[in-house]
């Protein structure tokens, strides 16, 4: 990428490049540092009660009925895995997201890998200047602080849930990082996700050891009624990134999470400027990943991950934080236009599919030279239609899975979704220092009725807020969410 002032001659290496007026404001692509994409076909969950730590809500019957169960069925039923992957990736694109946590896939041949699509994933970039981030640790590393420190020292970035909740048990997950010699199992590689239970002194420790954090305000407020003390984090000098978490208790994309961050910061009079909030999903996010030499800002020599918002605001930072999805007129990843209005997309070459965001016509370019064989040439429209059908027929699909003979299932070469919130027994997405292994969520799930008896038909979550007439109503019905968020958010879309 080369960057020159408006009206300046074209750079030497770009003499033959066409000049295209965007009629908008160009931003770095958004980097979502925390998102459980494999669940993002699901609509917002009406959180049944106020929780104080992460170990509680996963045991509620509604969680199995409305979240874990549906995605277990879709994630293991042939024909639906690729639909989920395509749909949630396009959900990112339509919200201006160019990088996210990846979608893990597991085959019945015993192979685990990450889906490689058009949106970058932080775990497997395939690029020397974009070092892979880790988002999971082994059981041993999750239960032994010394082993955890060794893992940190061998990682460029480790994105890990930390102190998710409001009670002392949640905070203990952070305090357990203190080693017997008085030092801390914290390095510049650690990016703690959520950090809701941390106190001001804890943020000082995090900053002194070079750690950073990922803030997910909407999900925190929906589940716990509180969010991280980002004012204390800012005062301590902790670098802060943003993550939309997942659609059952979070934003549809990082564009929405930026707006919630702005609302919360204003309500608390924290003093974050719009520029600082936007940096959480661009420049600071790239710093956390150790990608700042290649991404995070618009500078000569960096990769062209870009987002264009229609129109020119006198304050460009407010311009993005106040934009809806219909105003996103172009998204470019590594120099390749992936979604935008037809005028801009046609200027760059062919596209693969038309789509409508509310009343705004958009076209998508989902083609890849080395398309992931799991998804292939599946279109967004085909993915949407499959998921609508699958969610409407969950009990029937669950019964078919239940009745399928294990030998038949094993004979099919197939991939299934890894539902990382359920923590497979040999990996973890959060530390468990000092816990008895028997208390782990994956091991305390009590045997319940068969899924085909429990599940009910569900609606597919629309990919954008602009297309979801029920979104703000659902938010207003959330009992843990402060009124200032549910009342203030509609004006920013």
Question: What are these model-predicted stretches?
Answer:
Residues 21-90:
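Metal-associated gating/positioning segment near the N- to mid-region
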Residues 1, 23, 34, 92, ...:
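Divalent metal-coordination and catalytic microenvironments
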Residues 154, 183-189, 205-214, 235-240:
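Glycine-enriched alpha-helix->loop->beta-strand junction motifs that scaffold or abut catalytic
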Residues 179-186, 226-311, 322-337, 450, ...:
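His/Asp/Glu-enriched, well-ordered alpha-helical/loop segment
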Residues 1-28, 44, 119-136:
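Histidine-rich, glycine-flanked metal-binding segment
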Residues 166-173, 191-199, 220-226, 247, ...:
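A general structural motif
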Residues 340-412:
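Charged, amphipathic alpha-helical linkers/stalks
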Residues 81-83, 93-190, 196-197, 428, ...:
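Metal-coordinating catalytic core of metallo-dependent amide/deamination hydrolases
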């Amino acid at each position: 990428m080369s960057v020159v002032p408006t009206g300046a001659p074209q750079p030497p290496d770009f003499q033959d490049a066409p000049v295209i007026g965007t009629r908008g404001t160009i931003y770095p692509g958004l980097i979502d540092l925390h998102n459980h994409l494999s669940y993002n076909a699901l609509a917002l969950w009406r959180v049944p009660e106020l929780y104080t730590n992460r170990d509680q809500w996963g045991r509620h019957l509604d969680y199995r009925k409305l979240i874990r169960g549906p995605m277990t069925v879709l994630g293991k039923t042939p024909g639906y895995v690729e639909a989920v992957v395509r749909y949630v990736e396009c959900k990112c694109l339509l919200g201006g997201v160019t990088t996210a946590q990846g979608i893990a896939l597991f085959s019945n041949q015993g192979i685990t890998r990450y889906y490689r699509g058009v949106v970058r994933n932080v775990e497997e970039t395939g690029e020397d200047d974009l070092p892979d981030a880790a988002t999971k640790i082994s059981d041993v590393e999750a239960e032994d602080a010394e082993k955890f420190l060794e893992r940190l020292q061998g990682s460029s970035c480790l994105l890990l849930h930390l102190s998710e909740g409001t009670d002392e048990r949640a905070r203990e997950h952070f305090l357990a990082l203190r080693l017997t010699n008085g030092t801390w199992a914290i390095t510049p590689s650690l990016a703690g996700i959520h950090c809701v239970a941390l106190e001001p002194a804890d943020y000082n420790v995090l900053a002194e050891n070079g750690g950073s954090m990922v803030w997910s305000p909407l999900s925190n407020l929906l589940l716990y009624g509180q969010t991280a003390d980002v004012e204390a984090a800012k005062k301590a000098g902790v670098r802060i990134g943003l993550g939309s978490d997942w659609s059952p208790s979070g934003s549809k994309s990082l564009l929405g999470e930026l707006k919630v961050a702005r609302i919360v910061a204003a309500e608390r009079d924290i003093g974050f400027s719009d520029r600082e909030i936007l940096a959480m999903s661009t420049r600071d996010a790239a710093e956390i990943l150790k990608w700042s030499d290649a991404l995070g800002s618009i500078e000569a020599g960096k990769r062209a991950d870009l987002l264009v918002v229609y129109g020119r605001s006198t304050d460009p930072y407010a311009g993005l934080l106040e934009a809806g999805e219909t105003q996103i007129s172009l998204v470019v990843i590594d120099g390749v236009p992936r979604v935008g209005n037809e005028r801009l997309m046609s200027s760059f070459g062919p596209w693969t599919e038309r789509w409508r965001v509310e009343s705004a016509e958009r076209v998508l370019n989902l083609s890849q030279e080395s398309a992931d064989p799991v998804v292939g040439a599946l279109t967004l429209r085909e993915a949407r239609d499959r998921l609508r059908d699958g969610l409407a027929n969950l009990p029937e699909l669950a019964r078919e899975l239940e009745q399928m003979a294990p030998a038949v299932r094993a004979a099919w070469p197939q991939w299934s979704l890894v539902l990382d919130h359920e923590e497979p027994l040999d990996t973890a997405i959060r530390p468990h220092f000092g816990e008895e292994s028997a208390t782990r969520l994956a091991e305390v799930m009590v045997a319940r009725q068969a899924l085909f008896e429990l599940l009910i038909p569900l609606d597919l979550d629309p990919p954008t807020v602009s297309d979801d007439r029920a979104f703000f109503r659902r938010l207003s019905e959330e009992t843990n969410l402060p009124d200032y968020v549910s009342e203030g958010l509609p004006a920013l879309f």
